[in-house]
From Swiss-Prot:
GO terms for biological process: defense response; signal transduction. This is Disease resistance protein RPP2A. The active site is at E84. The lineage of its organism: Eukaryota, Viridiplantae, Streptophyta, Embryophyta, Tracheophyta. Its EC number is 3.2.2.6. LRR repeats lie at residues 1145-1167, 1168-1195, 1214-1237, 1238-1258, 1259-1283, 1285-1307.
Length: 1309
């Protein structure tokens, strides 16, 4: 049996440093922080550092994932350090090692250019040294100093920077691999494995993963390993394959390799089979053994959990469940086959790169996924086989798949599946569609159910089979027609809703008939307001889909998701929220009657509709009434047990509660919880009387229902004011309704359900400024304050800390706690005293708007003294602050949806209003912004509203400015600059793109973006930067405030300002970025237009509208461009060269489509940082020889460069190239050998009609497009392309022969 090991390198981190400067101070603290994060760091154990660098140290550098280079004053005095640096630089270039430079009391520019004190020290070291050695040192110093790192001069103290360095290293080491981000369903598997592994337990644990081949066991294990690795200092992922050798020496060999991998020790020798236990008994390890098929191997390597230290986890993966049992592994995760819906997503991910198919492939995808079966590997194989193929090819393949899978694919599947299921179905070829036109469709006349009330709607699908109104495929075309106006169910409609339907009609796209999912249709039904007949329509769709051959159990319209959509649709039609009040009306006493009246009156007062639900006098549960409400108030009294009927209904209500999102608020009216739980007091006698003649199982259901409702918690009343209780109950109901509509606030809902919790709870609420955190915290406080011995609500904590300082706030807090008469000061009260004093008292404490965890701890004396019955609620704009305050799970308040924003708008604006859509967009779902904007706009005349709204964006209300400023002012300079760049230039752009460009500008962009997310200033949606419009406006206002004159501002985006600066030649060194939308603009620029913009980092001239050309002319040429540019994007660049004086040393992206350039410039330039070059459709371009200097180039786009003939001298030099697009380069004839381009994944030569010859393919190509070329034969190296998934040879009419390809490549392509 042979083993292939796929664990990590020997060391996580290699530190390079001068021991004279940092060993006993900075380095010692850094190593401690790294060790605390379980990061394996190389230590030289006092190795003498004035000798020549030896082989062991070179090996340690090469086998480390990250090198931290600590530049200090005397770093360059050591040839040892400088030789180390050369090796690190080599590993950075050749092995993609991560390098983190740290500048300890030395400026980066001094290191980079060897100037100042650092340069003097370096000069002394260089004396008498060979020139080639000095040159290597200088190159390494310049290159490494140019990498984004940490400069101590930019940090308040060493401790803060050390913590940040350690955090950054940890993130770089342990970030989850992108390899698993697009694996469909992986999160559910990881969650299931986490519950089996019980990571919080200190006991070592051995578990198994079992399932057939192809089910995804290894993928799950690799994702699990990636996720858990940060928690274990020692870890290994090992894959085994069977071999015939199985003797004692082989077992020793297994152990040697196994321990070498885990311990990071080379050439380790073991003498006996007990070495695993002896080496790992006291170590916490993570071990994953993949593809195990030999019990002896398990006994040898992981004999029992006692061999490993506390907290260790061992995961064994096998197809043989009995092998796990034989090794006493009883905790086994059996990987299940995916559901039909999940199988479709797996197939689509492979076929289209996303979990849903394009609209014109929907029906085909459903059938292909069905025919592939439910084994993930088969689904992926078939998906990859169809990837990139045209729809006609799919249709052509379909008959073969239905009858018998084509031979090669079937042969592949047989390796994984014993039986290939066949599906024979007769598909109806066509669907007769309704003629569409601009007409008003009244469902009363043309569709049964338009005005049918809910209790009249036919539910069984069989009821539709005899209707002659429409053919089975007619429903979707009707609702898809955007010109159709649908009359909603008038029972539920009102003027507000009708106006919203018109508002939506202009915002939502039309629905494409027959090419939509169940969710698409239901979404469309909801937004187009076919709500009165939604259930009927869905029934019709269920029946219609049978015509497509979809089985009832596989029908997406029967899914729970559709049910929830229908309920959401019903929710949206309500004018007011309905709240149920459960009671036994026939047995009420005077107090209960009075209380129900008080509840009803208070509900009306707060805008709710009370629905009284009598549990007596009903044969069956009224489901319509239950589904019509989201909250039910249950009044529990002794009258409940006076009737079997009421108890049966209680059981039914609780069953409904368990399966829906109904919230129950119990009121224990003149009864005690202990009486209900233990059936004591008045409950006991009444229950015994009912019990005597009944079956035991019915009685047990009653008891279970009563236990469940008691577990919820609630309100008790024995005597006192019923009106006060009614107010408290209704406030509770109102808050719960709000929290239920707010995503991720389920924990706060749980908080309300367990008001008498005995454990200390520290809850946290976070979200962007103006989202409503304070309002929610205040509601919770007022609701629960009566139940606590001591309550304290400190609003505007951040502002109060600025005004009074934390010490004074602590004095106020102590005074509130103990009372001023006790005369205790902050210095008198220690945490231990607090713990003892409040040991048997309950405390409710709210700190609102916390911005600093240390301030919070200083005011309340830390969080350690709180104990049972104490509850702390914190609100903050920063999630990280809450985590630092020991909040286990912070709850985020989501922004308002468009619908919720619309409802809020209608509270202030009457009738139709032309700016509602703009108000919703401009507020970005922030309640504070929306209220203030709507309030201001509502005071204007209709004709002035739009202009007034635009002026508000340039000068927002004071409250919006103050809310934003507080967050912005708390950022450091790095984060402020990043935020302003994002606000001015990168909103809606890819995060990776922003990081690439801004890192080149000297910012720590990744860390900055993380901090901005934590501060709720931005968010990521599909890896794109999203920023609320009010925050973007405020960011731009800050830039405007820099100076009245645009030429003195750092960032320019307004076309009028930019044109003024450019045409007047008034640019200055203050300008760092220009993004000009030149659509419909025409202007002439001076040759010296950029002459004084020394600090310009980002330059983009573009056209946002198709068909327009960027008409910025340079009639007298262009003298130069700023050397600081990291982005140069200029569409339709008018000159034949870039300025010869331009030094692109900092250039990361050169994007100049449709330019007039013949070549970039004469001679060689420093292009070390250049990553992307896009010169597409530059029809005069003939020479790209200068790209040979761009050694780090990753993406080349030369599409449509029709004058380009030869690239043989430039492309082979781009050793890090990932994609090469030369589509439609019609004069290109050949390409040189690309065997050295090991990173190249995509090659596109489609449309290169004269292209004839390619010598060799890059070895790791995944996509090759040669359609329409004149190629005669393919290189034999195509047989070795193990990663190839797409090979396009369409219309290659001169292709004479094709090398025979391995079956694996044919299967993938």
């Amino acid at each position: 049996m042979a083993a292939s090991f796929c664990g990590s390198r020997r060391y996580d981190v290699f530190p390079s440093f001068s021991k004279v400067d940092v060993r006993r101070s900075f380095l010692a603290h850094l190593l401690k922080e790294l060790d605390r994060r379980l990061i394996n760091t190389f230590t030289d154990h006092g190795m003498e550092r004035n000798l020549p660098i030896d082989a062991e140290l070179l090996s340690a550098i090469a086998e480390s994932r990250i090198s931290i280079v600590i530049f200090s004053k005397n770093y360059a005095s050591s040839t040892w350090c400088l030789d180390e640096l050369v090796e690190i630089h080599t590993c950075y270039k050749e092995l993609a090692q991560i390098v983190v430079p740290v500048f300890f009391n030395v400026h980066p520019s001094q290191v980079k250019k060897q100037t100042g004190e650092f340069g003097k020290v370096f000069g002394k070291t260089c004396k008498g040294k060979p020139e080639n050695r000095k040159l290597r040192w200088m190159q390494a110093l310049a290159a490494v100093a140019n990498i984004a790192g940490y400069d101590l001069q930019n940090w308040p103290d060493e401790a803060v920077m050390i913590e940040m360095v350690a955090d950054d290293v940890s993130k770089k080491l342990f970030k989850s691999s992108n390899d698993f981000s697009d694996i469909v369903g992986i999160e559910a598997h990881l969650e299931a494995m986490s519950s089996i592994l019980r990571l919080k337990s200190e006991k070592a644990r051995m578990v198994g993963i079992s399932g057939p081949s192809g089910i995804g066991k290894t993928t799950i294990a690799k994702a699990l390993f990636s996720k858990l690795s940060p928690q274990f200092h020692l870890r290994a992922f090992v894959t085994y394959k069977r071999t015939n050798q199985d003797d004692y020496d082989m077992k020793l060999c297994w152990i040697e390799k196994f321990l070498s991998e885990i311990l990071g020790q080379k050439d380790l020798k073991v003498l006996d089979l007990g070495a695993v236990e002896q080496s790992l008994m006291h170590k916490k390890v993570l071990i994953i053994l993949d593809d195990v098929d030999d019990l002896e191997l398990l006994k040898t390597l992981v004999g029992q959990t006692g061999w490993f230290g506390f907290g260790s986890r061992i995961v064994v993966i096998t197809q043989d469940r009995q092998l796990l049992k034989a090794h006493d592994i009883n905790l086994i995760y059996e990987v299940a086959f995916p559901s039909a819906h999940l199988a479709l997503e797996i197939f689509c991910q492979s076929a289209f790169g996303k979990i849903y198919p394009p609209s014109d492939f929907r029906e085909l995808s459903v059938e292909f996924a069905y025919l592939a079966g439910n084994l993930p590997l088969d689904l992926r194989v078939l998906g990859l086989a169809m990837k990139g193929k045209h729809r006609e090819e799919w249709i052509e393949m379909l008959p073969r798949l239905r009858n018998d899978l084509d031979g090669k694919f079937k042969k592949t599947l047989r390796n994984y599946l014993p039986v290939i299921r066949k599906r024979v179905s007769n598909e109806e070829g066509g669907r007769e569609k309704l003629k569409k036109g601009n007409k008003k469709l009244d469902l009363d006349e043309e569709f049964p159910g338009g005005e049918i009330y809910s209790d009249e709607i036919p539910s069984p699908t069989s009821n539709w089979k005899d209707t002659d109104d429409f053919d089975s495929g007619d429903i979707i075309p009707i609702i898809a027609d955007k010109s159709t106006t649908i009359i909603p169910n008038r029972r539920h409609s009102n003027d507000d809703w009708c106006s919203f339907c018109e508002f939506l009609r202009n915002r939502i796209p039309p629905l494409n008939p027959f090419k939509c999912s169940a969710n698409d249709v239901i979404d469309f039904l909801r937004t187009r307001q076919v709500l009165g007949s939604t259930e009927a329509l869905v029934d019709r769709l269920i029946f219609s889909s049978e015509a497509f051959g979809i089985k009832p159990e596989e029908n997406p319209f029967r899914s729970q998701a559709v049910t929830s959509y229908l309920k959401a649709a019903r929710d949206m039609t309500r004018e007011k929220e309905c709240i149920l009040v459960f009671s036994c009306h026939d047995n009420l006493d005077v107090d209960e009657t009075s209380f129900i009246e008080a509840i009803s009156k208070e509900l009306h007062k707060q805008g709710f509709i009370p629905l009284t639900y009598n549990l007596l006098g009903r044969e069956n549960l009224d489901e319509e009434m239950l589904y019509g409400s989201r909250v039910g108030i249950m009044i529990l009294s002794s009258s409940y047990v006076s009737s079997r009927q009421s108890l049966d209904h209680l059981v039914a209500v609780m069953e409904h509660w368990k399966t829906t999102d109904l919230v129950i608020i119990p009121i224990y009216f003149k009864v005690r919880l202990s009486d209900i739980c233990g059936l004591k007091g008045r409950f006991e006698a009444a229950f015994l009387q009912l019990h005597m003649s009944l079956q035991e199982d019915r009685v047990q259901k009653w008891k279970a229902a009563m236990s469940e409702i008691v577990s919820i918690g609630g309100h008790e009343w024995t005597k006192g004011s019923q009106f006060i209780l009614a107010e408290e109950v209704v406030r509770n109901a109102s808050l719960r309704l709000y929290l239920k509509s707010s995503k991720n606030l389920l924990g706060i809902l749980a908080l309300l359900n367990h008001s008498q919790s005995t454990d200390v709870e520290i809850m946290g609420i976070w979200g962007i400024a103006g989202i409503g955190k304070t309002s929610i915290a205040r509601e919770i406080f007022e609701l629960h304050a009566p139940h606590y011995d001591f309550c304290y609500f400190l609003q505007d904590f951040h502002l109060m800390c600025q005004m009074k300082r934390p010490r004074q706030l602590r004095e106020d807090f102590i005074s509130k706690l103990f009372g001023e008469e006790k005369g205790l000061g902050a210095s008198d009260v220690k945490p231990s005293f607090m713990r003892d004093w409040f040991h048997k008292k309950t405390i409710l404490l709210v700190l609102d708007d916390v911005s600093n965890a240390r301030d919070a701890e200083a005011v309340i004396g830390g969080f350690g003294w709180f104990s049972h019955g104490h509850r702390i609620i914190l609100t903050s704009r920063s999630k990280q602050v809450l985590v630092q305050c020991k909040v286990k799970k912070p709850y985020e308040i989501q922004k308002l949806s468009d619908f919720e924003s619309f409802r809020l708008c209608k509270q202030y604006l009457d009738g139709e209003n032309p700016v509602i859509s703009e108000l919703i967009s401009c507020s970005s779902g922030i309640p504070l912004a929306l209220k203030l904007l709507v309030s201001s706009v509502s005071k204007q005349y209709i004709t002035n509203m739009k202009d007034h709204l635009q002026s508000l964006r340039k000068d927002p209300p004071t409250q919006i400015q103050e809310a934003f400023r507080r967050s912005f002012d708390g950022l450091d300079e790095n984060e402020k600059n990043i935020f302003l760049d994002l606000a001015c230039f990168f909103r809606g752009q890819s995060k990776d793109y922003a990081v690439l460009l801004l890192d080149a500008c000297g910012f720590f962009t990744y860390m900055g973006i993380c901090e901005l997310i934590d501060e709720s200033l931005i968010s990521l949606v599909d890896n794109k930067i999203e920023m609320p419009i009010p925050f973007q406006d405020m960011g731009r206002i800050i830039v405007h405030e820099e100076d009245e004159d645009p030429c003195e501002r750092s960032r320019l985006w307004d076309s009028k300002d930019i044109v003024d600066v450019l045409t007047n030649n008034s640019g200055t060194e203050a300008i760092e970025g220009i993004f000009l939308d030149a659509s419909d603009l025409t202007c002439e620029l001076s040759p010296t237009v950029f002459g004084k913009m020394y600090n310009l980092r980002l330059l983009k001239f573009y056209c946002s509208t198709s068909g327009n050309q960027c008409k910025l002319t340079l009639p007298h040429g262009l003298d130069t461009l700023p050397d600081e540019l990291s982005l140069l994007h200029w569409e339709n660049y008018p000159l034949v060269y870039l300025p010869q004086k331009f030094n692109p040393v900092n250039l990361v992206e050169l994007n100049m489509p449709y330019s007039n350039m013949e070549k970039l410039w004469e001679g060689k330039k420093n292009l070390e940082k250049l990553k992307n070059i896009k010169l597409s459709h530059s029809r005069e371009l003939t020479d790209i020889l200068m790209l040979s200097e761009a050694l780090n180039l990753e993406h080349i786009d030369l599409e449509g460069c029709t004058s380009l003939i030869d690239v043989s001298m430039s492309i082979p030099c781009c050793g890090k190239l990932v994609s090469l697009n030369m589509k439609d380069c019609s004069r290109l004839r050949s390409l040189p050998s690309m065997v050295d381009l090991t990173t190249l994944k995509l090659l596109n030569l489609s449309g290169c009609s004269e292209f004839e010859d390619i010598q060799d393919f890059a070895p790791n190509l995944e996509e090759i497009y040669l359609a329409g070329t004149s190629i005669r034969e393919l290189p034999l190296s195509i047989r070795n392309l193990t990663e190839l998934v797409t090979l396009d040879l369409e219309n290659c009419e001169r292709l004479q022969e094709m090398p025979s390809l391995p079956v694996e490549i044919i299967r993938r392509t």
